[in-house]
Regions:
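N-terminal strand-loop-strand
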Residues: 1-36, 65-66
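Charged phosphate-binding loop/patch that engages nucleotide di/tri-phosphates or the phosphate backbone
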Residues: 136-162
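Short beta-strand element of the conserved SAM-dependent methyltransferase core
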Residues: 11-13, 91-94, 147
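Intrinsic-disorder/low-complexity loop/linker signature
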Residues: 3, 82-83, 152
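Short, hydrophobic/amphipathic alpha-helical patches that form generic packing surfaces
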Residues: 128-136
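Conserved S-adenosyl-L-methionine
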Residues: 72-74
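Unchanged
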Residues: 41-68, 77-129, 159-162
Length: 162
């Protein structure tokens, strides 16, 4: 292990009982699959995951924080893959009533998925386990969770400031 890091962000936007997914194609990191809207940090964002996800959201779907309510970072995960540590910062937010996504997404196809069946879709390993945890537990709390990916899933724990 030589210390290579790959920090990434994603936001999962909800609207009622639906969640916005991006079927991403052409990624340098994962094969075509469903994920949240987001991407890699720019150098000036390395200490600001929120700035990264807001930039990615504006670029990919044309939305800003003013179009959402209750946007919060809810998960930070780590995974060792291909000799690098992948750091994922996952945000969740609710789309404000009346706001629509009108910008075509150049990263793939957008889909509003039912939360009851979202886990049936092909997703990156860590994203699937994060969404599974969110749907079972995370959406009912205001906690920030840390997760470490293993061969059998992701081990989550609430993060606490002390």
């Amino acid at each position: 292990m030589d210390g290579k890091l790959r920090p990434m962000t994603a936001v999962y936007i909800t609207s009622g009982k639906k969640i916005l997914l991006l079927y991403r194609v052409g990624s340098r990191v994962v094969e075509p699959s469903f994920c949240g809207v987001g991407g890699h940090f720019e150098k000036d964002e390395l200490c600001d995951a929120r700035a990264c996800v807001l930039r990615e959201m504006r670029e990919e779907i044309g939305l800003g924080e003013e179009d959402l309510c209750d946007m919060k970072m809810r998960y930070v995960t780590l995974r060792l893959k291909n000799g690098e540590i992948r750091q994922n910062y996952y945000f969740f937010a609710e789309l404000l009533p009346g706001v629509q996504i009108t910008k075509p997404c150049c990263e793939g196809c957008l889909e509003w998925a039912d939360m009851d069946s979202v886990l049936e879709r092909k997703m990156p390993h860590t994203a699937w386990y994060m969404l599974d945890h969110y749907l079972r537990e995370g959406r009912y709390t205001d906690l920030l969770y840390g997760g470490v990916t293993t061969g059998k899933g992701v081990v989550f724990t609430p993060m606490q400031e002390f």
